[in-house]
Amino acid sequence: MNIEKGTETVKKGMAQMQKGGVIMDVTTPEQAKIAEKAGAVAVMALEKVPADIRAGGGVARMADPEVIKKIMDAVSIPVMAKARIGHFVEARILENLGVDYIDESEVLTPADEYYHIDKNKFTVPFVCGARNLGEALRRVGEGASMMRTKGEAGTGNVVEAVRHIRTVMDGIRKVQNLPDDELMTEAKNIGAPYDLIKQVKEEGRLPVVNFAAGGVATPADAALMMQLGADGVFVGSGIFKSGDPEKRAKSIVEATLNYDNYDVLADVSSGLGEAMVGINVSDLEEQERMQNRGW
């Protein structure tokens, strides 16, 4: 059977291949090699990790293509890169570079406060963040092949990622329990495409894989998110802002694979050195919360 490259089936299938794995933010080829050796299923190529983006302020944009190309040349695993929300030209540049996935990301400063990228027009698959079922299904309707919780990136605090995965799962359970004649009203209420609401009811899950992201900093955090229903884990600042990145990277991979084995979790949580310095999300002003970007 000949399946055309870039079809919805192919793009979603590529994302399915990452299930159960860890995707790590990297800023150099050396970091990318550490991530690959630790067992990461993919890396996210950036100029700065979210903690540094948050600390630096200003406008955060797509990484320099030269940075991305060097990381792509350094590893054999898939390489992702971020584009600003609504910035379809950045996305086209990333597609031209040959990245394996594009993250239309709230970690970068949005280019458009009203419209997200029409991801159906691209050959490359997209990943997007969501805080609830409606937001997730809107992104899938636009062509996202993979979802992740938004969490609160760059904080080292998993509380918002927990809130978002629980909210999505609660939304799915609600839809499953609705009679068919109430699905259209629910689609209207949460701003989601009706056909995707029907699919959620039938399948009992999102139409695409849903990873945890935003504040995952320890093996225990990764295991927690997996037990709450995530299909895999993104780790941003939590690895290379820690005391022993190589050991922590391996430990988070092991914890994600063995998320319900407490013997393994106790072992991989031991002797990791200092974790990244965290931020209490409650201390952030509303305008400092990256999760509020997009709709």
Swiss-Prot record:
It holds the Pfam family SOR_SNZ. D-ribose 5-phosphate binds at residues 25, 154, 215, 236-237. SUPFAM superfamilies: Ribulose-phoshate binding barrel. The active site is at residue 82. It comes from the Bacteria. GO terms for biological process: amino acid metabolic process; pyridoxal phosphate biosynthetic process; pyridoxine biosynthetic process. Keywords: Lyase, Pyridoxal phosphate, Schiff base. It catalyses: aldehydo-D-ribose 5-phosphate + D-glyceraldehyde 3-phosphate + L-glutamine = pyridoxal 5'-phosphate + L-glutamate + phosphate + 3 H2O + H(+). GO terms for molecular function: pyridoxal 5'-phosphate synthase (glutamine hydrolysing) activity. D-glyceraldehyde 3-phosphate binds at residue 166. Its EC number is 4.3.3.6. InterPro entries: Aldolase_TIM, PdxS/SNZ, PdxS/SNZ_N, RibuloseP-bd_barrel. In the presence of PdxT, forms a dodecamer of heterodimers. HAMAP family: PdxS. Catalyzes the formation of pyridoxal 5'-phosphate from ribose 5-phosphate (RBP), glyceraldehyde 3-phosphate (G3P) and ammonia. The ammonia is provided by the PdxT subunit. Can also use ribulose 5-phosphate and dihydroxyacetone phosphate as substrates, resulting from enzyme-catalyzed isomerization of RBP and G3P, respectively. Belongs to the PdxS/SNZ family. This is Pyridoxal 5'-phosphate synthase subunit PdxS. The gene is pdxS.
